[in-house]
Amino acid sequence: MHNDKQRKYLENIVQGNVIEGRKDIAKTIRNYLCKSYSASKVAERKFEYFQGIKKEQENIIAELSYSNFWWVNDFASNYQYLAEGGEAKVYLSNCGTKVLKINDAVYYNTWLDFLNSIILHNIYFINTNYDLIGFYNIDKTLYAVVEQPYVVANKITELDAIKIHLSNNDFQHKKRFDFCNEKLGIYLEDIHDENVLTFNDTLFFIDTFFSL
């Protein structure tokens, strides 16, 4: 459940309004893009249709990264390659407490959608906060560089536990591993035991996909 201030904050994200408060890279770029673009809707998962818009946003992010020194040029000395999924390469920090995810937002229609997803994740799942530290460009492909606490599970995650946890934030189970907060119009997809880990009966949502 959310208090009035939190609810208004979430409504501003959904409605495409500028969000106030402490600014980080994700919020700064998201607010900038919202001046010219709207988030795509969950029913509009049409990558080819949004390809031009996504490229425009990529160019804007590149310009902002140059002017604000957001390019990440070297991380190899502090991280070791760990794994690779559909959209991200994952590296483990040398100290073993954090992971670095290099994400090209391939599953999102636009970069604005990707940034909204990061911001929503950080509201709902504080213990696995995404810290967007900058961007990385290789072979003409833009990647977001995101740091997150490293979590090791000691128990299998049960879907019923996920349902209970999410229902406390007004997310209702819709089908398979998808949930929806109908009051706010926020969708949360692909929530299963590989993306949600359990340690000492605490759930850690390590990989989420929010959409509006």
Predicted regions and their residues:
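Conserved structural core of kinase catalytic domains
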Residues: D104, N122-F177
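Short Pro/Gly-enriched beta-strand edge/turn motifs at strand-loop
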Residues: F69-A76, F171-F179
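Active-site ExK catalytic segment of metal-dependent nucleases
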Residues: V99-A105, P149-V151, D207-F209
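Conserved hydrophobic "DFG−1" position in protein kinase catalytic cores
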Residues: L92-S93, Y150, T198
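ATP-binding glycine-rich loop module of kinase domains
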Residues: K41-K54, I61, F75-N127, T141-Y143
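Juxta-kinase regulatory segment immediately upstream of eukaryotic protein kinase catalytic domains
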Residues: M1-S77
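Protein kinase-like catalytic core scaffold
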Residues: K98, A144-V146, Y187, F204
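Catalytic activation segment of kinase domains across protein kinase-like and atypical kinase folds
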Residues: C180-L212
